[in-house]
Amino acid sequence: MDVVEGTVEEWDDPRGVGTVRTDDGRALALQCTQLADGTRTTEVGARVRSTVGPGHHGRWQATDVEGLDP
């Protein structure tokens, strides 16, 4: 699986879902259960590193998501 860096582009806190835009332009689904710090929340604009893995309905998603911001 690819390891990528990107930015949280969309985040719906009540639903715990969003989108990561990778530095190479791909849009990956993001689920709160994939946030490595266990907080289950993030913010639009946060820089992240993740693995790309299979998601629902054949879409790719961000997995093992770690924040890059200090």
Q: For each of these PLM feature ranges, what is it?
A:
Residues 1-14:
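Structural detector for short beta-strands of small beta-barrel domains
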Residues 7, 19, 49-51, 61:
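Residues located in well-ordered beta-strands
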Residues 10, 22, 34, 64-67:
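A residue-level detector for short acidic-glycine micro-motifs
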Residues 26-34:
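A short macromolecule-binding patch
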Residues 53-70:
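OB-fold/S1-family single-stranded nucleic acid-binding modules
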